[in-house]
Amino acid sequence: TPPPKANVLQAGSLLRSLGAIEEKGGITAHGRSMSTLPCHPRIAQMLLRADTPGLSSLATDIAAILEDRDPMPQDNDADLRTRVNALRQARGKGGNLREWGRIEKIAAQYRSMAKALTDNDIPAPYATGLLLSAAYPERIAKARDGCGHYQLSCGDNAFVDSADELSSHEWLAGAVMDSVSGRMFLAAPVDPEDLEDIASARSNILWDSRKGGISALRELKIGVLTLSARPIGGDIREAVLKAICDAAPKDGLSMFDFSDEVGNLQRRIGLASSWHPELDLPDVSQEALLNNAAEWLPAFAGNASTVAELRRINLCEVI
């Protein structure tokens, strides 16, 4: 029996997000490498992205912790680093690992698979989050406030307990979470600079009605989240004019100065058009001017990019 279509689509979406398959479904070179590892694609992704001995060892410990049941109390913090440090501390003492024994056995299997060394040092502060962001790119989270509420890169909302130290971090990488409530049970802080390699660059030149002018930013995005935004340099005049023209039908009444003088001229031309249709006079109503801004704005706008500058355009001359 074939699996449900929804499950197939979800699996395809995951594999594409991990770079394992192309948009049309063909396997990538990275996907072939992932397929050689006998583990979940997320874990395979994490093991392959761990490109230093220290990260490789850490990835095997994270994989083991995620595969087994959380050995720490439910009321403990959600920081995965706490579990990694506890595992390494128990392993470093040798002898009876007690509740960590099963997890260490799994970690040893992953070390063998990844040809990684045993490492009991405390990892770098953001190393755990870096690896989680590779395995769970759709669960990269940015704080909405300072009280534990986050937005995920996939657009969903998530949260950690406001008393959890994790809530003080602007960026988190989630691992284990409740998809219904959005609660993150295991996560780790991540340095946004570490995410730049998996971010996509977008140049956005658009009219910002709130600030009354053009916004021209080059953004680094992960899903719906913005990592950084910098002003776009160079000659962007053509794009600026297009953005103004695109906004004119909706916001034009506040962008341009439709003075009484302009209104009087529009009415006179409208009357002349109705009395003498043979003149075939153009429609110079507000709606027509704004809908057809691309026809006249380039000749009159100069370098205007704000409401104050656009309102200096003499619409009587335009008409």
Model regions: which residues?
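Short acidic-glycine loop/turn motifs at beta-strand connectors
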Residues: E22-K24, S153-G155, S162, R210, ...
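Acidic, serine/threonine- and proline-rich low-complexity intrinsically disordered segments
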Residues: L55-H149, E170-I319
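Accessory beta->alpha helical hairpin/"wing" motif in late/C-terminal subdomains of nucleic-acid enzymes
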Residues: E22-D51, S56-A63, G148-Y150, D156-A158
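A short, sequence-level motif marking secondary-structure junctions
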Residues: A163-S167
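A glycine-rich phosphate-binding loop feature that marks nucleotide/adenosyl-phosphate handling sites
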Residues: P2-N7, A29-S33, I65, A78-V84
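Generic structural signal for well-ordered, non-membrane alpha-helical segments
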Residues: P4-V8, H40, L55, I103
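Nucleic acid-processing catalytic cores of prokaryotic defense/repair systems
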Residues: L132, P137, C154-D156, V160-S162
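C-terminal helicase lobe
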Residues: T1-L18
